[in-house]
Structures are given as C-alpha cells and as structure tokens.
Amino acid sequence: MEYKHHALIARLVYKDLDKEVKKEFKALGYTTVKFFDIEGAQAYILANKDRITVAFRGTEPKEKSDIFADLEATHTNGFHTGFLEEYEKLQLSVHEEVAKLQGRKQRPVYVTGHSLGAAIASIFCFHYPEAVALYTYGCPRNASWKKAKELKVPHYRVVNNNDIVPKVPPAFFNFAHHGQLRYINYYGNIRELTTWQRIKDSWRGRRRAWQKGQVFDGVYDHLMDAYCECLEDNE
C-alpha cells in the first residue's frame, strides 16, 4: 500500500497547485497541502492528523536548472553537486514548514520523489534523520560510497525493470546507491532478485519493448506513469 500511495504522490507533484490538484491530494487523505516553487525547484508538504509527507518534484525538460543539476556530476560534501544545489534551494522553507507542522502535533514524516525529485528527497533525509521512511522511484545515484553509508532513514528504492536513470551517474565516478532495492520485474511484480536474475529479467523487458516498437525501453520504464501502472497491478 505504501509503495502505491507514495508513487501517486510522486506523480502528482509534477503538477502545480490548483483546486483540482488539491482535490487529488484530498482523495489520498491529506487535509493540508503546501506548495513550494523556489528558483525552479519544487516540493509539496502534505499533512493530515496521522502523518506528514514531503514530496519533491523530478526533472522537467523546460526547467534549465533541472537539466544542469542532472549534468553536474561532481561531488560537494559527499553529495552530487547538482542535486545538492537543488535541495539547498528548498532546504530552509521545507525544514521550517515541517517544524511548524510538528510543533502543532507530532506525526511520522514520510519522504518521496521520482527521478531528480528522488535524489533531492534522499539528500533531505540525510539532513532530516527523524523521517520514518523514504520511498523513491527511479532514483539516480546521489552520494559518494562513504556518504551513502551514513543514511539513517529506512529507504525503499523502487526501480522499474530497465529504468535507465538509476544507472547514472556511473559508480566509477564514486557515486553509490543506498537503501533497500525494490525491483519491479518484467511481469510488473516487486521482487528481490539476484544480479543474474535481474540481468535475465532486463532482457525480457527489452524484448517486450522491441516487440511493441518501444526503442527506448529504459526511458519508458522511467516514466512515473509506468511505475504507477505496475504498482496498481501489485495491489
């Protein structure tokens, strides 16, 4: 249930706040909806009487800062420089809002995001270890091997079959994943597979994509709609 719930949120954060979006968040159980848009970086903070959810928006092709962030594959304080810069745009506002909500009533804080938003969500959790769980979808590597070991928040890293984004930046540039991999296989099911099993499953996915005329299978599998479709079938 949590995988699907946070996936729906991670998809919704690509929309700016309006009445319809507020209704969609309400349908997911949230009575408080806050939207932040700072220098091309966006986040939502959602709350109800039982929980707070912090969600970060992923890459938007129209946002030059998003593209530059993705390409800035150097390190700053153990983090991917581009992703860290996007997080820092939102850092003060998001942390202040979470503190304000917690000041009214203490609730568990969940964090989520897709693509670039997943990377920002990860960095947020390094700075907010009180979060109870981090759910990411198509998350790129965002920390050095040493820094990745320092994450205290339970991280459920969902990867859809041949999604290309979790493969970058390359590990040989000293970038690592963290958290527990939750792999969506060729059949659309969440499974824990060995490396060899994932390789075989990856080829099944490519073959299916070619049969459908989908040349860029890794790009299609990265779409948040593809994640939501698979997780809907898992319910």
Q: What is each residue range found by the language model?
A:
Residues 1-112, 116-235:
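Non-catalytic, mobile gating and regulatory segments of ester bond hydrolases
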